Amino acid sequence: MRCPFCGHPDTQVKDSRPAEDGNAIRRRRQCPSCAARFTTFERVQLRELTVMKKSGRRVPFDREKLNRSIQLAMQKRNIEPDRIDQMISGIVRRLESTGETDVTSDRVGELVMEGLKNLDAVAYVRYASVYKDFHKVEDFREFITDEALTAHFGPREDDDG
């Protein structure tokens, strides 16, 4: 594998171990030219996925883009990185296992919402605020109430209960 730092065409594997509950292999590599170390992951890819955007555009599915959007919602949340990786792997497996190569951006968003709801309520609401395009505070209130998340955030001040 080419070194991402100096471009040397061959790197050495220093350590290799299972990751993501055995669904991936994590490899630590070192470049013999510049001595830089980096990590790679090897995963099974059942099929090439294409995401159909709301605009009609079709783009290749990008696991890293999915990871970045979830990491943004998880910012400053005390969640183990392995749990996030497991959630992402689960989403990808579900998308690949449908047998379809085309998936809608809505379907990807729904799966992320489902995963975050089970993982962290604050991250769930953060992601929803972008995915569902919240524009005002009332949008948050309605979403939290509609999604029965009051147990996570407490009752509204104007509730009579």
Curated annotation (Swiss-Prot):
Stretches assigned to the ATP-cone domain: 49-139
One GO term of the biological process aspect: negative regulation of DNA-templated transcription
Stretches for region Disordered: 1-23
Needed co-factor(s): Zn(2+)
Cofactor note: Binds 1 zinc ion.
InterPro entries listed in its UniProt record: ATP-cone_dom, NrdR-like_N, RNR_NrdR-like
Source species, domain of life: Bacteria
Recorded GO MF terms: ATP binding; DNA binding; zinc ion binding
Keywords: ATP-binding, DNA-binding, Metal-binding, Nucleotide-binding, Repressor, Transcription, Transcription regulation, Zinc, Zinc-finger
Keyword Nucleotide-binding: yes
Signal peptide: none
Zinc finger map (unnamed): 3-34
Bias (Basic and acidic residues): 11-23
Protein family membership: Belongs to the NrdR family.
Free-text function comment from the UniProt entry: Negatively regulates transcription of bacterial ribonucleotide reductase nrd genes and operons by binding to NrdR-boxes.
Official protein name in the record: Transcriptional repressor NrdR
Gene: nrdR
